[in-house]
Amino acid sequence: MTTIIDGKALAKKINSQTKELVAQLKEKQNIIPGIAVVIAGDDVASLIYTRNKHNKAIKLGINSVLKKFPADVSQAELLAEIEKLNHDDTIDAILVQQPLPPQLDPEVITNAILPTKDVDGLNPLNLGKLFANQHGNYPVACTPRGIMRMLAEYNIDLQGKNAVIVGRSILVGKPLLALLNNANATVTMAGRSTGDLSALTKTADILIVATGVPNLIKATDVKPGAVVIDVGINRLSNGKLTGDVDFEAVKTKAQAITPVPGGVGPMTIATLMEQTVDLAWWRHHG
């Protein structure tokens, strides 16, 4: 019988642990973890997602500051705000919501965030540590961190397994490649333009799809008994949310699969909150 990986339930468990830890930090050490969420523009989906993060932080007892800028904000203005947040002792974590308006360079903006406050784990210093599999305290991209947590929670063995990632983004695909490789999986990365993608995905014991293409992966693209992680979240013309995987068809072949919604999405926010607390702890305790 196929296991449906319940990201919503696991996220609830993580959030409960985070809330308890935040309360203990406040009571015993007078530490209040803080996050600043920065958004530029009026993309509806981004605004909703940003508001959800802000509200979740407040609910867990984290000090959350929402910095909203108009779509025509200059890069200099946004960089000046990030610099202020870098030096703000009440802020442990800085998140810049993407996508950004076209006049802003995501690489420049990301690199301006102090590595020690880079809650998305996208600063080159943090990415370099991840790819080098360095020990120590540094942030890791939240969605990949959440995926690894799900795999661990469901006792999915990665040692020596073939893992295929479809999607090469810096937010998901590339950090996940490093994490899976560090866990001793044999990892292949592909994209939508990969020749004979189906032949490749059918070799996967662990298949992770993050392309933003609704129902890209069909049952015929999946090896029987594979573990399928669907990172995509797409809204169809009828308003229905769907992933990058044809869930109903693929679940008949998979050993385990994440639904959309209720799979990876809740885990991303839960790990964002968890990592904000980590950053606060590391800042005060090294």
Curated annotation (Swiss-Prot):
GO terms for cellular component: cytosol. It comes from Limosilactobacillus reuteri (strain DSM 20016) (Lactobacillus reuteri). Belongs to the tetrahydrofolate dehydrogenase/cyclohydrolase family. Catalyzes the oxidation of 5,10-methylenetetrahydrofolate to 5,10-methenyltetrahydrofolate and then the hydrolysis of 5,10-methenyltetrahydrofolate to 10-formyltetrahydrofolate. Its EC number is 1.5.1.5, 3.5.4.9. One of its GO terms (molecular function) is methylenetetrahydrofolate dehydrogenase (NADP+) activity. The gene is folD. It catalyses: (6R)-5,10-methylene-5,6,7,8-tetrahydrofolate + NADP(+) = (6R)-5,10-methenyltetrahydrofolate + NADPH; (6R)-5,10-methenyltetrahydrofolate + H2O = (6R)-10-formyltetrahydrofolate + H(+). This is Bifunctional protein FolD. Homodimer. NADP(+) binds at G167, R168, S169, I233. GO terms for biological process: L-histidine biosynthetic process; methionine biosynthetic process; purine nucleotide biosynthetic process; tetrahydrofolate interconversion.
